[in-house]
Amino acid sequence: DVHIYNDEIRKYGNVNNNILSFFDTGITTTNAVAFSKTNDLSAFRVSVSDMRNWDIVPESELSRTSVSFKGNTQLSKRLTVEAQATYSYESVQNRPALSDSPSNLGNALIGIAPSFDQKWLSSNYKDETGRYNDWNGDKYRINPYWVINEMSNKSKRDRLIGQGRLYYAFTDYLKASFKAGLDSYTFRFTDFTPMYTPGFTDGMMKEMTNNVMQYNFEMMLRFQKRFGDFDVSAFVGGNVMRYEYESMIQTGQTQVIPGLQDITNYSSIETEHALVRKAVRSLFGQVSLGYKEFAYLDATFRNDVSSTLSPKNRSYFYPSVSGSLIFSNLFEHKEWFTFGKLRASWAKVGGDTSPYQLQLEYGLKPYTNKGTSLGYITSGSVPNANLKPTSTYSFEVGMDVRFLDNRLGLDFTYYQQITKDQILSLPVSQSTGYSRAMINAGEISNKGIEAS
């Protein structure tokens, strides 16, 4: 017999399946139903799915419900409409903590001796007054039964992804389209740590709400026609993208009424608010030419205007051109020579940066000085008002030949890529008051040969 941490007497001996017996058998169920209908002019499909998961960790579960719709209809000989949308709702109770969190169940369980039955902790994790029973003197390994029975967290997420398209055919070879897309979700998370928890003896509660929305509007005009031996296709279009992220976090310290899970039940409440916005306007196009199914030429262009760059640098243009020649079509068919193609391409690609890298960012401290709010610089990085877009230039030539009915072949490529004005956050001396600085860095080049 041995005395355990609360002076109870228990039998001494090795405990079989000591850690395994703490966990439950995980169960996941999925149910789905779908409806669809089609006729000569229209088609649609609606589906509903529901997933429930009861985790191996006691008191932890997840549920997710999704509803999807997809349909199209031909309103006239020239006009067609398509739409699709998916809505999902997810609810999670008590996500298990990970890594070095004090409430990580694994950290506490792996530290239990083989002769100490973890079930002894289940009836002694708190005393008769509701206070935590300190079983090991380690605030980083909290009693796992206190974690699952007294501490709690929950989250809910709503997400809507939708897209609608209009197609209009002016002629058989000239068509226009308009597309609008939306991706929006709200994530709400609450984390409750009761009074007397090691490391949080006064209690703590955190509520977080994240709202994210991104939408795109795009218009395109397409042309495709054959002129004698030439195949011609082209399109030109424009796109507008807007992104917005908003976060609100409230943290309550020092609980007033023990056990009451409400953010107003704390004597100290800190609020953090963040708002990030980005917009990109684009114009793009492509022309493709084909001659007698052996010579091809493609040219593209794109011009982006990004809100994350300074007015003089926010518009950047990047084109490309590529061509190929299937020279095997120039000769009479040979049994030993199956296929041969030469190809070459050149392209430029541009890129912007994340929002708010051009100027200092400011925030307010949660406390005041004689009733006056205190402001501060929130970023630890030196901004750069003259950031340029990153540019990557690539060049490639190659040959693909095959013999003996594709039994033998050689694919050879030479490539070169040069990246200029990379946008980097580099470390600087902290004596400057900052830890990093935003810069456009020099030039990086790589080239090589590939053969297979």
Predicted feature residues:
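Periplasmic N-terminal accessory/gating domains of Gram-negative outer-membrane beta-barrel systems
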Residues: 16-26
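Predominantly transmembrane beta-strands of Gram-negative outer membrane beta-barrel pores used
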Residues: 22-23, 30-52, 56, 68-74, ...
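Transmembrane beta-barrel architecture of outer membranes
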Residues: 28-30, 62-68, 282, 316-320
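Residues on the lipid-exposed face of transmembrane beta-strands in outer-membrane beta-barrel proteins
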Residues: 33-37, 69-73, 162-168, 219-223, ...
